[in-house]
Amino acid sequence: SFLEGMATLRQLSFGLLDIGWHGQDPSSIQRVKDFENEEFQETNLYPDIAENAMSPSFSHIFNGGYSSGYYSYKWAEVLDADAFAYFKEHGIFNREIGEMFRTHILSKGGTENPMKLYKRFRKQAPNPDALLQRAGLL
């Protein structure tokens, strides 16, 4: 879809910034803007506005329970797209796949390692290509 690549890159950059902030000693960061420039180096497509610092207003990564977990937005989309692709491969209303989803995902909740549960359901690790295909990026 239109500008899907930009939206995806934007979310990835937010996740990388979050992990960057929580992956090192904050006292080692001298200037917020320099730190952001370093973190956004791989995802920035356009020149940045020198006076603009995102971190001070990006409350998700400092309060609200997302500390070093902002990436989970995009990861949830990967899981959603990959699980739905599995349903589509076997017929959207396939009873056996639905039962496997209920048995290995829904009924287990947080009682076991989520990746182990997902692999039991899907019989493989989540494939990010499913999200890229759904978004029209592959």
Can you name each region flagged by the protein language model?
Residues 1-138:
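Cation-handling catalytic/transport regions enriched in His/Asp/Glu
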